[in-house]
Amino acid sequence: MEGSVNQSKWQAYSHLMRINKPIGTLLLLWPTLWALWLAGKGVPSLSILVVFVVGVFLMRAAGCVVNDYADRAVDGHVKRTAARPMPSGRVSEKEAKVLFVVLVLVSFGLVLTLNAMTIWLSLAALALAWAYPFMKRVTHLPQFVLGAAFGWGIPMAYAAVSESLPLSCWLLLLANICWTVAYDTLYAMVDRDDDLKIGIKSTAILFGRYDKLIVGLLQFATLLLMLWVGYLTQMSGAFYWSLLLAGALFIHQQKQIATRERDACFKAFMDNNYVGLVLFIGIALSYWQG
C-alpha cells in the first residue's frame, strides 16, 4: 500500500515537471545546441555539452513547477489544465516549492563547473524562469519573457565555450525570441477562450484577428535573423538549405491554423520541434562539411 502511494506521488511530481510531455524541453534544447555549436565552431567539449543538456532538462522542469504554482488558482477552471497535479490536489503548494528549490540548486551546481561569466549569466536565467508565469497577470506580452527565458541558454553557451558574447550571440537570442513568441502564440490560441474568461493575458488575445499575420511576421523575422547569423558565422550551404526547409515548415503551420481550430493550432505549435531540429542539423552540417 505504501509503495503504491509513493509511486503515485512520484508520478504526480513527474507530471508537474512535464517529464511525460518533452516538447518544452526540446524547444529549449534546440537553441541551446545552436549556440553551443556556433560558439565552438563545431562540436563543443563533452563536459560542457553534458552540463547544458542536463541543465535544459532541469530548468525546464523547474519552469513547469513554478508555472503551475503561479497558475494553481486558475488551472482548475481550464479544461486542458484541470487535471494537473496542483489543481487536482495531488501535489501541495509546499511540495511544489521544495521541488522547485531542489531543481534550481542541482542546476546551479552544474553551472558552478563552468566559468565565472556563465555563472553570473545563470542568475538572469533563474530570474526569467521565475518571472514568466506571473507576467500573464500583468501584461499581454508574457511570450516575450518566455522567449528571453527559453533563449538565455544562448549567451550562457557562448560564455561557457568562448568567454565572449559577439553580435552573432545576440542576434541568435533575438531570433529565438521571435520564434518563441510565434510558437507560443499558437499555443495560446488553443486556450484563448478560456483565458479570456479567467483574466489570463497573452499575445493571442492581444493580436486578436491579426494573430495569424503577426505570427507569420515573427516567423519571417526569425528566418531573417538566422540568415544574418549565418552570414556572420560563415555558414555553408547546408545551413541555408535548412533555412529554406524551416521556411517551408512555417508556411505549413500557417495553413494548419487557417481556421484557428484548437487542435490544428496545437499541432502547429508541436511541429516547431522540427523547425529547431532542422536548423540544428543545418548548423552541424556546416561545420562537418568545413
From Swiss-Prot:
Recorded superkingdom: Bacteria
Q: What pathway or pathways are given for this protein in its record?
A: Cofactor biosynthesis; ubiquinone biosynthesis
Give the main location: membrane
Q: Which GO terms describe its biological process?
A: ubiquinone biosynthetic process
Which InterPro entries does the record cross-reference, listed alphabetically? HB_polyprenyltransferase-like, Prenyltransferase, UbiA_prenyltransferase, UbiA_sf
> Where are its TM segments located?
23-43, 46-66, 99-119, 141-161, 170-190, 213-233, 234-254, 268-288
Mention one GO molecular function: 4-hydroxybenzoate polyprenyltransferase activity
User: Where does the record place it?
Assistant: Cell inner membrane
The record ties this protein, via Pfam families, to:
UbiA
GO cellular component terms?
Answer: plasma membrane
Q: What cofactor does this chain's UniProt record say it requires?
A: Mg(2+)
How is the protein disposed in the membrane?
A: Multi-pass membrane protein
UniProt-listed CDD domains: PT_UbiA_COQ2
- Reaction it catalyzes: all-trans-octaprenyl diphosphate + 4-hydroxybenzoate = 4-hydroxy-3-(all-trans-octaprenyl)benzoate + diphosphate
Keywords of this entry: Cell inner membrane, Cell membrane, Magnesium, Membrane, Transferase, Transmembrane, Transmembrane helix, Ubiquinone biosynthesis
* UniProt cross-references to PANTHER family, sorted A to Z: 4-HYDROXYBENZOATE POLYPRENYLTRANSFERASE, MITOCHONDRIAL (PTHR11048:SF28), PRENYLTRANSFERASES (PTHR11048)
Q: Which family does it belong to?
A: Belongs to the UbiA prenyltransferase family.
What the protein does comes down to: Catalyzes the prenylation of para-hydroxybenzoate (PHB) with an all-trans polyprenyl group. Mediates the second step in the final reaction sequence of ubiquinone-8 (UQ-8) biosynthesis, which is the condensation of the polyisoprenoid side chain with PHB, generating the first membrane-bound Q intermediate 3-octaprenyl-4-hydroxybenzoate.
Protein's name in the database = 4-hydroxybenzoate octaprenyltransferase
**Species of the source:** Serratia proteamaculans (strain 568)
